[in-house]
Each structure stands twice: as structure tokens, then as C-alpha cells.
């Protein structure tokens, strides 16, 4: 199992390859706001653990294992963002909130959150009802 830090790199590499068709050390460093030498060290570790294939100066390619995990990590992140929107978290806080919790939830919890997102998306009245509860609670606290 990858560590939370490894997950961040795999997720970002997956997104870059999906968006650009490739992922360079400099692109990964910029996206994660880290030094390129840190990226190189992590990429070498991910190569050793068979999440990707890395050749210095030639770029990198995710292995089947890396692609599968990358896809699952992107799904988890997107699902948690959807969940935050449904429960009414301010848009400007969603990304940081998701980054703060995504590595601490079990895959079972992610699956149950997925069920809840699906439940709310199947009937918009449910979201409206939730908003009504939130408004009532805000009025009580004022």
C-alpha cells in the first residue's frame, strides 16, 4: 500500500498524464509545490515499488498497478469534493478540506460516502431538505 505522500504523487502523475499525455519531474514539482529533487527521489521510490517506470531524462510511465491506483485516488478525491458540495461546504474551502481528510478515510468509508452522494443526487429534493435543516440550524445559533 502506498503512503499518503506516495498517493499524492501517484494521483498527480495520473492527472498530468491524463491531461497532457505525459508527466515530467518539473510538472509534478510545480503541481505539488515541491522541489524537483524531492520529486526525483519519490519517483525513484515509486519506480522501485512498481507503480511507474522511470528513466532519467526520458520521463515516466505509470504501470498497470500505478494506473489502477491513480484512477482510484482521483475517484476518491472527486467523490469527496462532490460530497463537500452536497453538504454545503464553501467552495473556497473544499480542496483543502479534501486534501486534509482523503488519506485518513478507509475505502469502506469512501464507498459509503459514494452511496450517500448517489442518494442525494437521485433526488434534488433531498439536497433542498438538507439546506433547510442547515438554514434552521444557522438561525438557532444566531
Swiss-Prot record:
MF-aspect GO terms: DNA binding; DNA-binding transcription factor activity; manganese ion binding; protein dimerization activity
SMART domains with a match to the protein in the record: HTH_DTXR
Residues that, per the record, bind Mn(2+) 1: 8, 99, 102-103
Regulation: DNA binding is strongly activated by Mn(2+).
GO CC term (a single one): cytoplasm
Compartments (UniProt record): Cytoplasm
Record note on quaternary structure: Homodimer.
Name of the protein described by the UniProt record: HTH-type transcriptional regulator MntR
The species this protein was found in: Bacillus cereus (strain ATCC 14579 / DSM 31 / CCUG 7414 / JCM 2152 / NBRC 15305 / NCIMB 9373 / NCTC 2599 / NRRL B-3711)
Amino acid at each position: 500500500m502506498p503512503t499518503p505522500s506516495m498517493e499524492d504523487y501517484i494521483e498527480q502523475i495520473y492527472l498530468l498524464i491524463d491531461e497532457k499525455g505525459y508527466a515530467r519531474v518539473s510538472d509534478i514539482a510545480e503541481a505539488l509545490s515541491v522541489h524537483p529533487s524531492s520529486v526525483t527521489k519519490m519517483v525513484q521510490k515509486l519506480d522501485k515499488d512498481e507503480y511507474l517506470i522511470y528513466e532519467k531524462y526520458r520521463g515516466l510511465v505509470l504501470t498497470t498497478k500505478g494506473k489502477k491506483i491513480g484512477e482510484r485516488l482521483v475517484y476518491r478525491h472527486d467523490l469527496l469534493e462532490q460530497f463537500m458540495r452536497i453538504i454545503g461546504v464553501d467552495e473556497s474551502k473544499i480542496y483543502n478540506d479534501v486534501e486534509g481528510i482523503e488519506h485518513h478515510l478507509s475505502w469502506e468509508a469512501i464507498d459509503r460516502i459514494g452511496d450517500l452522494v448517489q442518494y442525494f443526487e437521485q433526488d434534488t429534493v433531498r439536497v433542498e431538505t438538507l439546506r433547510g435543516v442547515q438554514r434552521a440550524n444557522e438561525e438557532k445559533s444566531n
